[in-house]
C-alpha cells in the first residue's frame, strides 16, 4: 500500500526490525533498486544473511537512530508490539521518535503497525494504543497523506504515510 503501484521505476527500501528478512517474500525483487534490512539482534541478522546470501540484499546490525542513508520507503513491522517492562509513556515516546526518524530518512513514505487498545485480551508486556493518539502527531508532519488500515489483521492498525512533495 505504501509503494506507488503506478510508478514503474525501481525503489529503495529500508526494513526496520527486519528479523530474518521475511518481508522479502512479499517484495517484487525486480522492482527493488536496493533493499537494506536492519535489526539490533545479531542472531537474526546472521540468519537473514545466510538465508539470502545469493540475493542482492543487505542485512546489518544497526541502530535506526544512527541511520544516515535515505530510502524511497521505510517499512517497520512488529517492533512496536512488545514493550516488556517499559512504561506506556516511554513506549509512546519511542514510537514517536521512530516515526520522526522514518520521516527524516524516507523520500516517498513509510509504514508501520501498532496494536489497537480495543482488544479482548491484554498482556502487561505488550503495547496497545488508540490510533487517534498518533494521528495529531502524524498530521503535524508536512506534506503527508495518512492511510490507516485496521481491517487486515484483528487488533492491529497499519499506518501508511505517503509524502506528497
Write out the residue ranges for each language-model feature.
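Conserved beta-strand signature within the Rossmann-like core of class I S-adenosyl-L-methionine
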Residues: 106-114
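Core SAM-dependent methyltransferase catalytic element
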Residues: 150-165
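Conserved SAM/SAH-binding loop
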Residues: 61-65
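Class I SAM-dependent methyltransferase SAM/SAH-binding core
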Residues: 14, 20-58
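A short SAM/SAH-binding and catalytic strip from SAM-dependent methyltransferases
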Residues: 73-92
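Conserved alpha-helix/loop element of class I SAM-dependent methyltransferases that forms part
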Residues: 1-9
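A short acidic, Gly/Pro-enriched loop at the edge of an enzyme's catalytic core
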Residues: 66-74
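Short alpha-helix
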Residues: 127-142
Amino acid at each position: 500500500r505504501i509503494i506507488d503501484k503506478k510508478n514503474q521505476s525501481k525503489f529503495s527500501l529500508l526494513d526496520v526490525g527486519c528479523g530474518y528478512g521475511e518481508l522479502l517474500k512479499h517484495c517484487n525483487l525486480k522492482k527493488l533498486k536496493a533493499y537494506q534490512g536492519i535489526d539490533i539482534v545479531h542472531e537474526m541478522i546472521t540468519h537473514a544473511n545466510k538465508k539470502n546470501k545469493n540475493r542482492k540484499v543487505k542485512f546489518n546490525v544497526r541502530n535506526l537512530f544512527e541511520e544516515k542513508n535515505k530510502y524511497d520507503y521505510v517499512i517497520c513491522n512488529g517492533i512496536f508490539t512488545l514493550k516488556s517492562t517499559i512504561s506506556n509513556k516511554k513506549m509512546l515516546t519511542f514510537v514517536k521518535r521512530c516515526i520522526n526518524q522514518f520521516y527524516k530518512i524516507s523520500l516517498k513514505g513509510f509504514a508501520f503497525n501498532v496494536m489497537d487498545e480495543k482488544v479482548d485480551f491484554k498482556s502487561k508486556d505488550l503495547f496497545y494504543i488508540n490510533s487517534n493518539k498518533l494521528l495529531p502527531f502524524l498530521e503535524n508532519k508536512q506534506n503527508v497523506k495518512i492511510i490507516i488500515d485496521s481491517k487486515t489483521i484483528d487488533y492491529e492498525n497499519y499506518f501508511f504515510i505517503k509524502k506528497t512533495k
